[in-house]
A protein has these predicted regions:
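Early-domain small/polar-rich strand-loop-helix modules and first-structured segments
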Residues: 11-86
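C-terminal, non-catalytic interaction/recognition modules in large multi-subunit enzymes and RNPs
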Residues: 50-64, 75-160, 167-412
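Residue-level signature of catalytic and energy-coupling elements of molecular machines
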Residues: 1, 39, 165, 179
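Extended hydrophobic/aromatic-rich secondary-structure runs
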Residues: 3-27, 242, 246-248, 253, ...
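Short secondary-structure junction motifs
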Residues: 5, 160-162
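Gly/Thr-rich phosphate-binding beta-strand-loop-beta motif of the actin/hexokinase/Hsp70
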Residues: 1-12, 44-47, 177
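FAD-binding core of FAD-dependent oxidoreductases
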Residues: 5-7, 39, 195-201
Length: 412
């Protein structure tokens, strides 16, 4: 979650790719990560229209920015987080205002919300407070961000509650707990560089080279057909491997994956099907994937192969250490209560259904690995704000913060 939009993708042991996408009516045929984007970010504008709270898609952008940027901008999600107490003004640089030498202006945000609240109450006949109005917009923004997550999980036959929510972007930590709870997710992970991880991650990422050829084969189980497919796949694999060898990767650091773009005859929905490591039993993989995504199979239809694709992955690192979940599991219950809480300053923060609660503000650099922080709390550093809501517990690990979401009996 950044300033203008939120990007969502799903990872289940491997990256999910699409071969084409449509943006603003234009179809782009190019392999890319399957990423859904919605207009909900820190600068998404807030409106009250036809009796409804509306967030986006208009954006205040970086200039003029939200109202609190001191440039006459409109109300935005950042203003809602500010007036509800979720942002630590003192941590923001003094780069706002006409001369870009001032801090955030919470008073401007409050005045704008007071005017909007008066308008909403007059139109609806209700007596909402500024906090309730601001929280209402935050709730709408969270729901907007939940939709693409449901599209990538529930709409494809996967239970959202069985996933971990990994959050990135400067605004992600402010909404992570609320979104996880709305989706029934029990665990949230935020890397210590989550707000700048696009740059950090590129330095650590594996390098990938793909080659593909169109095909008009029918998967008919005959040795001749399989031999033709294998021969073409082997040739593509050599091309892909040679490319990474030329880029300096050792042969033992290159991993090859073979895919067939398969579909049922008479349909236009092809699925990229990964070849199993120890066989060419592609039909069963395709059928299982099709059933998972659509809930049925067309057992009386022939299976066509639209193209053959080989992906070569050059490993940048053998290992980056234990995963966050593995480190948390190894630590078990041996977390210590965070000592920094004893001296932390507090401020009243508004929480949905709870009202204003005294909430400690703790700098991440003051927390040691394998300490825990019960919610409510705000964890901050120079690049991010993590809101730990009530009935949530933040566990500090060596490279990340892992938040456990607690539910009532019978909930996920």
């Amino acid at each position: 979650m950044g300033g203008t939009s939120t990007d969502v993708s799903r990872y289940a042991g491997r990256y999910e790719h699409v071969m084409e996408t449509t943006l603003d009516g234009v179809t782009i045929q190019s392999p890319q990560l399957d990423v859904n984007t919605v207009a909900s970010g820190g600068s998404s504008c807030l409106f009250f229209r036809n009796g409804l709270f509306v967030v986006g898609p208009d954006s205040a952008s970086a200039h003029p920015g939200p109202t609190c940027y001191r440039k006459g901008g409109p109300l935005a999600i950042t203003d809602a987080n500010l007036v509800t107490g979720r942002l630590a003004i003192e941590m923001f640089p003094r780069i706002f205002g006409p001369n870009e030498n001032e801090g955030l202006d919470i008073h401007a945000s409050l005045q704008a919300f007071e005017a909007l609240t008066t308008h909403i109450n007059a139109e609806t006949g209700r007596t909402m407070s500024v906090d309730e109005v601001a929280q209402g917009f935050i709730r709408v923004a969270n729901e907007v961000m939940c939709r693409p997550i449901r599209s990538l999980t529930q709409a494809r036959g996967f239970s959202t509650s069985k996933h971990v929510l990994a959050c990135f972007g400067g605004a992600g930590g402010q909404h992570a707990c609320s979104i996880a709870r709305a989706l029934g997710i029990k665990t949230v992970v935020l890397h210590k560089y989550s707000s700048i991880l696009s740059a950090f991650g590129m330095a650590l990422a594996d390098r990938v080279f793909e080659v593909q050829e169109p095909s008009n084969e029918t998967w008919d189980h005959t040795p001749a057909t399989l031999e033709r497919i294998q021969t073409r796949a082997d040739a593509l694999a050599k091309r892909a491997q040679d490319e990474l060898l030329a880029q300096g990767f050792a042969r033992d650091r290159i991993h090859l994956e073979v895919y067939l773009h398969m579909r049922y005859d008479g349909t236009d929905t092809a699925l990229m099907t990964l070849k199993p490591a120890d066989s060419w039993n592609m039909e069963s993989v395709f059928v299982d994937t099709y059933r998972q995504e659509f809930g049925f199979v067309l057992s009386n239809r022939a299976i066509l192969i639209d193209d053959i694709r080989v992906r070569a992955v050059g490993r940048t690192f053998d290992s980056l250490g234990p995963s966050v979940l593995a480190e948390h599991a190894a630590q078990g219950t041996r977390y210590a209560h965070a000592k920094a809480l004893d001296t932390a300053s507090q401020r009243p923060v508004y929480f949905d259904g709870e009202g204003r609660l005294p909430t400690p503000i703790v700098r991440l650099k003051d927390l040691s690995a394998f300490e825990y922080v019960p919610g409510p709390a705000i964890l901050i550093d120079e690049t991010q704000t993590i809101l730990v809501e009530p009935r949530c517990i933040a566990h500090i690990l060596t490279q990340a913060v892992l938040i456990e979401i607690q539910y009532d009996e019978g909930r996920p």
